[in-house]
Amino acid sequence: NDAPALKRADVGIAVQGATSAAQAAADIVLTEPGLSTIVTAIVTSRKIFQRMKNFVIYRVACTEQLLFFFFISCIFYHPSQFNESWPQHFAIPVIALVTITILNDGTIISVAYDNVHASMQPEKWDLNILYIVSSAIGLTALASSVLLLSSALSSVDPTSTWSQLGLPAMSYGEIQTLIYLKISLSDYFSVFNSRTKGWFWSRAPSVILVGAFIIATGASTLLAVYWPFGNGMVGISWQLSGYCWLYVIIWAIIQDAGKVLTYSILQYVGWVESVEVINEKELKKYAESLGDIEVE
């Protein structure tokens, strides 16, 4: 008898133990007695929303760095000006880009299993805010990549900053590999910048996300040192890869500071509201009390 009413309702809810017809007509089917399952569904949906926001920010930030960097490096950088034997335009082999993409996909998938907090109030999509935050992260990574490319190309000049720091001169193939490693690491570190509004250490990541990060960064570093695919790229030394790691970590902190500043400015001008999160311990007690309430 309830099936027609459930079908006409905006949100039809069938309780645990309802008939098959009622469950088929309902939009939501409670799988346990009481109202606690409704609370669980709301909290879970808000956590999914948070993970989707983090995914979008991370994906856009990585894409901005990758696409804009190769556009700028191909158009405005001419390696032949630094060494006549080098090509006129800077480029990285397709196999390197494919490797970055494949390893990055694993990190992206892990975002779906990250630790997040459900918000106290319902949230809605604001693509403008997501794009602004993504750009703050992605363009900072872009600037660091362009700066490293400029310094690496000038490594053959004894008077350059690179040489004055005591770093060795590099061949063109080594420069390609160094840039490959830098972009890879920047992308993987950006996942920690994208997942919080505050500093990246304000909320612990999930084991799955950390595991994906370790695998991706480890594989990228090994490939950079023992580059097996040829195509003009040459493996770099462990020392140089260590310097690249240090460079990326410093810029990752700068990225995070830029993100925190961006959110602060957006909150100050009223574009972003300060959202409180649900206390998981109090929620559990509340859900247990609702579990004792039977729904007729």
Language model region names:
Residues A9, I13-W199, Y226:
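Membrane-embedded transport module
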Residues N1-A9:
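Acidic, divalent-metal-coordinating active-site segment for phosphoryl/phosphodiester hydrolysis
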Residues C62, I100, L153-E296:
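C-terminal transmembrane module of polytopic membrane proteins
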Residues A5, A112, Y263:
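Active-site-flanking alpha-helical
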